[in-house]
Curated annotation (Swiss-Prot):
<dbReference type="GO" id="GO:0140359">
    <property type="term" value="F:ABC-type transporter activity"/>
</dbReference>
<dbReference type="Pfam" id="PF01061">
    <property type="entry name" value="ABC2_membrane"/>
</dbReference>
<dbReference type="InterPro" id="IPR005981">
    <property type="entry name" value="ABC_transptNodJ"/>
</dbReference>
<dbReference type="GO" id="GO:0043190">
    <property type="term" value="C:ATP-binding cassette (ABC) transporter complex"/>
</dbReference>
<keyword id="KW-0813">Transport</keyword>
<dbReference type="InterPro" id="IPR047817">
    <property type="entry name" value="ABC2_TM_bact-type"/>
</dbReference>
<feature type="domain" description="ABC transmembrane type-2">
    <location>
        <begin position="33"/>
        <end position="259"/>
    </location>
</feature>
<comment type="function">
    <text>Part of the ABC transporter complex NodIJ involved in the export of the nodulation factors (Nod factors), the bacterial signal molecules that induce symbiosis and subsequent nodulation induction. Nod factors are LCO (lipo-chitin oligosaccharide), a modified beta-1,4-linked N-acetylglucosamine oligosaccharide. This subunit encodes the transporter.</text>
</comment>
<keyword id="KW-1133">Transmembrane helix</keyword>
<feature type="transmembrane region" description="Helical">
    <location>
        <begin position="148"/>
        <end position="168"/>
    </location>
</feature>
<feature type="transmembrane region" description="Helical">
    <location>
        <begin position="60"/>
        <end position="80"/>
    </location>
</feature>
<protein>
    <recommendedName>
        <fullName>Nodulation protein J</fullName>
    </recommendedName>
</protein>
<dbReference type="InterPro" id="IPR013525">
    <property type="entry name" value="ABC2_TM"/>
</dbReference>
<comment type="similarity">
    <text>Belongs to the ABC-2 integral membrane protein family. Lipooligosaccharide exporter (TC 3.A.1.102) subfamily.</text>
</comment>
<keyword id="KW-0472">Membrane</keyword>
<dbReference type="GO" id="GO:0015772">
    <property type="term" value="P:oligosaccharide transport"/>
</dbReference>
<feature type="transmembrane region" description="Helical">
    <location>
        <begin position="125"/>
        <end position="145"/>
    </location>
</feature>
Amino acid sequence: MSGDSVTALPGGSLNWIAVWRRNYIAWKKAALASLLGHLAEPLIYLFGLGAGLGVMVGRVGGVSYTAFLAAGMVATSAMTAATFETIYAAFGRMEGQRTWEAMLYTQLRLGDIVLGEMAWAATKAALAGAGIGVVAAALGYTQWLSLLYALPVIALTGLAFASLGMVVTALAPSYDYFIFYQTLVITPILFLSGAVFPVDQLPIVFQTAARFLPLSHSIDLIRPIMLGHPVVDVCQHVGALCIYIVIPFFLSTALLRRRLLR
């Protein structure tokens, strides 16, 4: 494995597809179990909080609390699916299975591998988010066409959290460290981004912090789409998600290059 192969830049514009395809072939053998695993937690939130708090809260922003929550759970499902794929699964392919090492002996470069891992994580995020959306549409909390319109944003959400997850993978010495990321980063993001309750109900300091969280931008796009409301500040939200995709991508590849060349 040479230093040239462990470069931060992709070797070709479509080389990442080989990585995506490899992961897809390995995943499809256990696809149903994987999908059900990613759907379980958001569905528990949807039905548990929706049935419990929905009675007490009533309506939020002119819609039922369950409809409000459903849109948040679509974005949350994309976040958790992409995060799991790029920390636990990608770390396993890098360290335990040594799959990355084998790939780097081919024409693939490190940038291709990272990009392929991110694309695969975004694919799983889109499937997970769409799965929650299908349940919401079947129960009448959104329109089927609205769910279709939300799919690009769901995938973009997956890419953003996949990119962040790759940074964590690059830094983590072992699997044990991922619990800190999930507990100290992902869980606060869930509760501060407006997935479960409106951001404007939070103290001002948390409202300010929420503006910088990727899930907030995702929800601000997905929720109005699913509820049939006008979407405002589209360029701002999409631009913020793109920043969360691009900057961590280059950071993770640089960190991984240093790690793999030790």
